[in-house]
């Protein structure tokens, strides 16, 4: 019988534990972790994500600041907002919600964030730490997936892990984290030939392509572990993953649902990294 990998339950457990750690830090050091979220424009999906992050931060006892800026803001003005938070000792994590309007260079915006406060883990300095085997700030979705695999006793050593999607946000950092656990990793993408055949070799399949119900059971070998990163809307507005859950669950050993799988863990890891940044600030 397929085991459901419940990201919502694990995220709630982690946030309860984190709230206790935050209270302890406040009592002993007088420090409250601070998270600043910057939203540019009024993209509906981004607004939902930002509200969820803000709500979660307040739940665990963080100081939470959200800046909502016009989609017409110039790049220099946005960088000035970031630099203000870089210099603010009460803020330990800075997150700029992506995507940004087309006239803003997201690479320059990421570079403007102090790497020590880059809780999304996108700054090249943090990418370098990850690829050199000394991770500091790691992209939240891949690190959340690793927590799920650990919680559900998935031993990655020697396993063949296949990732569909090569983004800097999920695919590439995911590959490195899996390599660090001695998995054999195949990173696939839109130009990969015979994708179905490659996927059927996977002991662990991680899907992040942004196409609803793209992966059917023909892609899955019996007993595989399937992690669905996708968040899509069907014709009725229902949230669905990249994996056709019902039919894939017939052959997979373990599988994440959408919603309630990877999504809650992404926010949990964002909070954890902000807390760790606050903790490091006490060691200066």
UniProtKB/Swiss-Prot annotation:
EC number: 1.5.1.5, 3.5.4.9
Biochemical pathway: One-carbon metabolism; tetrahydrofolate interconversion
CDD domains: NAD_bind_m-THF_DH_Cyclohyd
Assembly information from the UniProt record: Homodimer.
Keywords, sorted A to Z: Amino-acid biosynthesis, Histidine biosynthesis, Hydrolase, Methionine biosynthesis, Multifunctional enzyme, NADP, One-carbon metabolism, Oxidoreductase, Purine biosynthesis
Pfam families in the record: THF_DHG_CYH, THF_DHG_CYH_C
Family, as annotated: Belongs to the tetrahydrofolate dehydrogenase/cyclohydrolase family.
Any one GO molecular function term: methenyltetrahydrofolate cyclohydrolase activity
Name of the protein in its database record: Bifunctional protein FolD
Residue sites binding NADP(+) per the record: 165-167, 190
């Amino acid at each position: 019988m397929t085991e459901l990998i419940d990201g919502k339950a694990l995220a709630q457990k982690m946030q309860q534990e984190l709230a206790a750690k935050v209270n302890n830090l406040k009592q002993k050091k007088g420090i409250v972790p601070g998270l600043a979220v910057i939203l540019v424009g009024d993209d509906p999906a981004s607004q939902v994500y930002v509200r969820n992050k803000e709500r979660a931060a307040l739940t665990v006892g963080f100081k939470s600041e959200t800046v909502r800026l016009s989609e017409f803001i110039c790049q220099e003005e946005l960088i000035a907002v970031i630099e203000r938070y870089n210099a603010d000792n009460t803020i330990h994590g800075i997150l700029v919600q992506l995507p940004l309007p087309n006239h803003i260079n997201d690479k320059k915006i990421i570079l403007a964030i102090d790497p020590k406060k880059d809780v999304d883990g996108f700054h090249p300095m943090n990418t370098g730490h990850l690829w050199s085997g000394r991770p500091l700030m790691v992209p939240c979705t891949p690190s959340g997936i690793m927590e799920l695999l650990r919680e559900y006793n998935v031993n990655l050593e020697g396993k063949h892990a296949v990732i569909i999607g090569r983004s800097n946000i999920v695919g590439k950092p995911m590959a490195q984290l899996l390599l660090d656990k001695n998995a054999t990793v195949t990173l696939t993408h839109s130009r990969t030939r015979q994708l179905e055949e490659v996927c059927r070799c996977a002991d662990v399949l991680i899907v992040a392509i942004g196409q609803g119900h793209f992966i059917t059971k023909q892609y899955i070998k019996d007993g595989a572990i399937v992690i669905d990163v996708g968040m899509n809307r069907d014709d009725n507005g229902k949230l669905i993953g990249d994996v056709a859950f019902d039919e894939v669950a017939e052959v997979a050993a373990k599988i994440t649902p959408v919603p309630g799988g990877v999504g809650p863990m992404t926010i949990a890891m964002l909070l954890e990294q902000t807390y760790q940044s606050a903790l490091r600030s006490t060691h200066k």
